[in-house]
Each structure stands twice: as C-alpha cells, then as structure tokens.
Amino acid sequence: MVHIVGAGPGAEDLITVRGLRLLKQADIVIYAGSLVNPGLLKETKQGAVIYDSAKMTLEQVMEVIEQAWKEQKEVVRLHTGDPCLYGAIREQMDAMDKLGITYDICPGVSSFCGTAAALQMEYTLPGISQSVIITRMAGRTPVPERESIRQFASHQATMVIFLSTGMLKELSKELMAGGYSPDTPAAIVYKATWPEEKTVRTTVAELAEAAEREHITKTALIVVGNTVAQNGYDRSKLYDPGFTTEFRMAESSHSGKIVSAVPEIAASGKLYVVGMGPGSLDGMTKEAFKAIGDCQVIAGYTVYADLVKPYFPDKEYLTTPMTKEEARCRMAFECCMEGKDTAMICSGDSGVYGMAGLMYEVGVN
C-alpha cells in the first residue's frame, strides 16, 4: 500500500495524527527533501529505508514504489503541506493506476493555513472578502491566461500567491494592472511555522523592496488584499444572536452589550484557538492535540467537546448554547485572566470561517 501523506507546512508537530501514524509504520519513505522538515524522519521505525525525492525523477520514484509493492512493503510518499496543492501527485497516481498499485491520500495542513497563523489573520472577513484565490505566477510551469495574476486581481478578493518570490517586481505590476491600488496591504511570509519563520507586512507596490530588505528570495508565500490589515470588517452573522442558523433560532433582539462589556484583558494564562481538522480526531495535528492537552480549560460547542473528552477527561469544559458564542469567548478570556491556559476548539482551520475572527473581535473590544 502507498500512502500519499501531507507533512504540513513546516513545523514537525503540524503533521496530522494519521499522517504521523502512517509515517511510523512505513517500511519505505520517499520525502520531498527540499521542503519537508527532516526532523519528521526521526519518527520512522528502525530499518525504514528513506529516499530524498528532490534528487529523483518521477521514473526513479516509481521504480522504488513498484519494487516495494512487489515486496508487499508499506510506502509513505511524504509531500510538503497538503499534497493536493502544487504537489505533482496526479502523475504519480496515474502511474500507480497503470501498475495496479493501491494508494490513498492523507491530507495535510497547507502552508497557506500556516501563513494565516503566522500573520494571526482570518482570510475571510465579512464586508471585505469572502473568497480566497490560491494561485502562482507563470514560470517554467505556464499558467492559462484566464488564470493570470492580472485576471484574478480584478476580483479584489484575498489572494495567496505561491512559488513567486523570485518575481516580485513583475508580480506587483500585474497586481496593480489588474486593479489593486499601490497601497493595498500585502504580506510576505517566509517558511511559515518553521523555526526561522519571518513575516513582513508591506503594500502591493513595495513587495520587491520589502523582500530585498529582509533578504527573502524563496520559500515564501505572498498574501494580498484588504484582509491583510484585519480591520474595517463587519460583524460575523455566524455568531450573531439575531441571526438564525440551522442549529439555533434567533433571539428577539441583540443589544451588542456582550462585546462592548468585555473588560480590558490583562491575561496571565494563554489562550489557544485550535482548529480540530475536517472530521475525525486523527485529522488533527500534533500541535493542536498538544495545545489542548496543555490547557486546563477547553471551550467549544458540545459536539466538539464530546469528541475530545475521552482523551482529556480531567479538563474543565466550557460549553454554551449556540446563541452564546460571544459569551463563551468572554468566559474563555476570563479563565485566562484567572491564570488558566484555555483552548477554544472549532472545526477545520480556525482562520477560515472559524472562531479566530470572533475571538479577535471580542479580544480587541
């Protein structure tokens, strides 16, 4: 069996629980040596054979996989981030299909999620942008004209741009030609979640100068759009008591007093906003699992709390009805003020339609 595994954006503890389990069980590991944190290789079992695919062609990779298949060995093909983004996995899967080799995919945390975490931002701010465009500049791999930077820039959505750090002068020109003003907020994030992570806030017009000043020439993502500033947004309807959802009925009125009454925060405990992944707990990262384990208090919807209780039965749990999200945020801050480390848990990634924005809003107020 071949497992195509996303290693996460860089930090060793951002591989998922499932990905780590598969890595530990593998007889053979083929990893993207130029991008995957080599520290993950310490998790392989004794006797595992490790190949660095940065020095291999597709044909050489497939020779290793085919031989392992014949010998009934478990293979992990370890890709950076999430394999579905710029991972070149389709050609590998096509080759395995022709050979009759079975495989599966273990998703990973993409570097664009790590980038949002590094910037402490939410990509999808109400009233500013509800869409994220993930793209790249044309290089040795061409980009269709309909998907050019200039075409996408006309949408004025949040843009996360991969594989383009060496072309920032041209990138700025294309962004402005597409409609972004020169002073549109932008950010450069170098090696998101790695120990050497670096974040630079700048503008569309000054991308190249900012990168040169900080000596950033590769391995960085570019974020463009008014969401980078993280201000001027509308209140989220998702957590507004006056808004009806499938899970709750609207309250008759909403005074806004919960937000305005939040006291000045001088927290002595730590507050973590933790994305639990897409579903089952083996989709959670080691970092997320550790953050929850390190906290005395866990706050969240009852359904999420029930998922983690079997693993953390001795924690203090804060669960409120679905009309009381802001109250739960306030209670979490109050626990921090009492010196208790607190985890606010939510599904998926906390920065994409998640709790991070509401926690930020309540905290600021």
How should these model regions be labeled?
Residues 1-55, 151, 262-318:
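Glycine-rich, flexible N-terminal cofactor/catalytic loop recognition
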Residues 2-4, 60, 71-75, 131, ...:
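A contiguous loop/helix-start segment that scaffolds small-molecule binding in enzyme catalytic cores
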Residues 9-12, 35, 80-84, 139-140, ...:
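Short glycine-rich anion-binding loops that position phosphate/pyrophosphate groups of nucleotides
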Residues 9-10, 34-36, 52-59, 109-111, ...:
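Short, acidic/turn-prone active-site loops that include or flank metal/cofactor-
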Residues 11, 84-155, 198-201, 280, ...:
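Class I SAM-dependent methyltransferase SAM-binding "motif I" and its flanking Rossmann-like core
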Residues 18-22, 44-47, 92-95, 149-152, ...:
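Short, solvent-exposed amphipathic alpha-helical segments in soluble enzyme
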Residues 31-33, 52, 76-80, 103-108, ...:
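General beta-strand structural signal in soluble alpha/beta enzymes
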Residues 56-70, 88, 323-340, 351:
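Short phosphate-binding loop-to-helix
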